[in-house]
Amino acid sequence: LLVASDRDNRTNLFGLELHSGQIQQLTDLNPLPLPREVEFLRACVSDTRDEAYFWYGMELRALDLHRLETRVLYRMEDGWDVSMINCSADGRHVYASVSEDMSSRFRVDYLRGYVGFRETWAARPLSRILRIAVDGSGGQTLFEESYWIGHVNTSPTRNELLTFCHEGPWNEVDNRIWGMNVETGAVWKIRARQEEGEAVGHEYWHADGERI
């Protein structure tokens, strides 16, 4: 089991061996200046490779869970805010959502009180869904729009399917959950709002990769 822990005023990734209870530190990262910071809410683990993936600043890194060595898969250019990542079912790609960095326009601190959350939603930042190869050969933009995108979730069984969300106040976004076929580029509403003020969120895939 992988967990994040704050120790000695630093945030790092740790492995917990469930049978013995032994904890091992897996990363040794220096703190980053705000508005960037080290946090593993956005990390993911491959089902096919002994690797975990996480953002460190603007770098998407791969961590070998045995050798504890890291490598940089991709670097996002400045002016963007990186968000959730998820691995494809076959382990060949990491998918990520990114959006325009709004911190120069108003105060942003989502992790401490959702500061700037509503303002970011109202600003409708340009957002993208990226596909990044785990072999280090680079990444590409699959989809973009002027609406705050977050929570890219890949099907655990079907390489071509993922969901993403329109981020913002759940009861006010135009539609929370969207599906995407990364092979055809088709995008559709997974579940349209059924009544005014309805709030939908925190969607996850079932293990069959067909239902959320």
Model-derived features: where do they sit?
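Surface loop/turn motifs at the tips and blade-to-blade linkers of beta-strand repeat domains
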Residues: T27-V38, Y74-D78, L142-Y147, I190-E196
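Beta-rich catalytic cores
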Residues: N9, E39, D81-S83, P125, ...
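Short, conserved, GDST-rich strand-edge loop motifs in beta-rich repeat architectures
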Residues: D6, S97-R124, C165-N175
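Blade-terminus and WD-like Trp-Asp/Gly-His loop motifs, strongest in beta-propeller folds
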Residues: L1-L2, R42-D50, W55, I85-H93, ...
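Structural motif
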Residues: N9-G15, G57-A62, S104-V108, R124-L130, ...
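Beta-propeller domains
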Residues: T141-I212
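Short loop/turn segments that connect beta-strands within beta-propeller blades
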Residues: E17-G21, L65-L68, A133-S137, N181-G185
